[in-house]
């Protein structure tokens, strides 16, 4: 087993042996390894998940060492969201071990592909979201991968990291894994002592025989426990929240010590014996390819080995997204590869229809699409009759731009292909998809594709399951026997990604004489491949309106679109909450009380929780108290989707904003009332995610956009794609959790998207100007 002792002297970050695999032992990422261990990185004869014989596996999730160190295997990818910690807490709540001795470890995607889930993990107890021991139907059956139905109930159930599902979908079987391991340890101790198992108890990693007071540690009985048959299922009981001792407490992230001491291994850090480097340049216009290139110009450059053209990726391997063909230079170092690539003449073959597109004509096409028949998603009451009457009609059109993820770690992957095996080192949110792609590209059976998980320098909706993996696999397949490390430049990372789709929305309301809506019609338009087209609008409105219609409209563009923080919710939340603010102002009513009254009129089963969120946030902020000139407050309410029997996590925020007369915007304070349900796993992690989301969506509101010029994205680095600076972060963020009788839908990326609508309404209150197109830096925000 790789040494993970934090007391080892740390090397410089680039001297840390940067690989994510321990082929002779269980896969461990983020731990110090001396350079002498380089030769042990790859062991083609060994299974990627093989267990060190000195360490005993209790089950697929729990490994206990003789020194009582407990390793918890985590199937989801740590992106900074705290999943290593939260998922480990769920296992350890039931395992009842010493939390200070817990170490996280990535579970093996290879093992997941070979083994079936134990029968005892297939029973999900409870009757639904309101049952503290329930979760309704499991949402994690089957393997997540493209082009294949997969194997239902594979070992780790769900290895994709997305949709705010790591805690939500994992809680029950992870707690069961901890409970099963605990019972095996108890049975082993009872057997060793020759006593009934009913006479032994465990706490903090120590097993006690109650009548005699004898004790054993988990490490002492682990070898016997590993060989103990599965316990009686009746003994594997999951604790209700009232019995939690670890879950619900604030715990620092387990991965932080490794990161701050330079011991974490990211994909960009991987180094292998004999490894060569690949620098890549893709056609800047999506759907384009290489027309010609002149390798002779660089053949004799230092370190250059070859130039390889790669085709437009097979859509079957990358979710039908349109990317580009390109070319890579292979060299002894990345600097040599990149320098030669920049010197080499390349001519691109660009589809003329793509080159003719720009942001202006694409936006115009989306607006025109809303005038055509769309797909009606919701049609309640009789909107046509309501709009044809004597009601006052209020209409507004909003727009949001293309947005990338702008992650800190550029795309990269290291791949070694031999005649009978593929090894991949990558930070990946969908490892099974990447294994499937590797099998298709190389022709090597998927069972012989080994993915060694690395940490990621940000994901924000997607990482790994895109063209960097396919490109690296393609190049390594052309250089069998030689490890190829592909690393994108920052510019390549911008243009070889998928974007959140450009979008527009037209919202129309019919208001009665008192200013209350009697009908609302929503039309949205975005790229036809954009995910989340119905977010926020797909159910009966949370705000009471007797007549409601929602339709979606699409256009087919060549810019690849995909998941990006919150998917469709951030844009749609901006449309909806901004429109509610505008309706309140048109009616001459307080936006907080306007929302509160409309919610109270609905028959939604959880309207009391939404009102509680609004009331709490308003009270926290001092809503209604006077503010100095140039300052304003705005309120908004969020929930995600309608999963879990019509219930989802509820969050209300009040944004206090100041704007100088010169137009400088500052988010002074944010007050958040966030639903706790019947318990959060790690409240500290939730707080950090909420704070991070506030900063992220402030960027969306004020700065971030990608423009299309001659068919290509114009912004390709941080000099043209501005991000907020630390001085722009709100100096005060207050978060209050409130309990409800529900299990939560997950944190995800979209709990604080309403920063956008909050700033929009504050701009209106302070300057008298109503802007409906993001980002706001494009508008005149001065006032006098």
Positions of the model-derived regions?
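Structural alpha/beta core scaffold segments of enzyme domains
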Residues: 2-674, 705, 710, 717, ...
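Short, conserved loop/turn and helix-capping segments at secondary-structure boundaries
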Residues: 465-469, 684, 688-692, 753
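Amphipathic, heptad-repeat alpha-helical segments used for oligomerization and assembly
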Residues: 567, 736-751
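Cytochrome P450 core scaffold surrounding the K-helix E-X-X-R motif
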Residues: 677-681
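Active-site "cap" helix and flanking loop/linker of ATP-utilizing ligase/carboxylase catalytic domains
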Residues: 684-720
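Conserved phosphate/anionic-ligand binding catalytic regions in large, soluble enzymes, centered on
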Residues: 694, 750-759
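C-terminal glycine/acidic-rich active-site capping loop/insertion
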Residues: 723
